[in-house]
Amino acid sequence: KELASKNNCVVAATGKYDLVADSSTCYVIKNGIAKMEKITGTGCQLSGIITSFISANPDCVLQATAAAICLMGLAGEIAFDKNDGNATYRNKIIDAIYNMSPSDLAKGAKYEIR
């Protein structure tokens, strides 16, 4: 929150728990699996998803960013359940994003607001 306040922006950091904050609110997102950090391109995919969510919701940057990160983490969980190996995992993440409905995201998002 302090960094977001100092720079008048939304800050996002990913890791075991993903954090998305503005000056007053912080989402702690618990979707995803550790294996995602070893897959080349997941960060790039996430950047594109965040950009598209913010573009579609420019007045809700904090919530759009949190939703995008929930979506990517949930897609990683779904892909892991269907995983055949490291090479196919990346493709399964893309498939999970493509096939995810708004209700799937609403049911599967794991977060708390602080």
What does each of the following model-derived ranges do?
Residues 74-114:
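Charged C-terminal helix
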Residues 35-40, 83:
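Short, surface-exposed loop/turn motifs that are enriched in glycine and acidic residues
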Residues 1-4, 61-76, 93-94:
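Short, well-structured alpha-helical segments that form the helix of a local strand-helix-strand
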Residues 9, 13-16, 47-58, 99-110:
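Hydrophobic transmembrane alpha-helix bundles
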Residues 1-37:
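Conserved phosphate-donor
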Residues 18-32, 57-58, 81-84, 98-100, ...:
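N-terminal loops that bind phosphate or other acidic moieties
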Residues 40-71:
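Short, small-residue alpha-helix embedded
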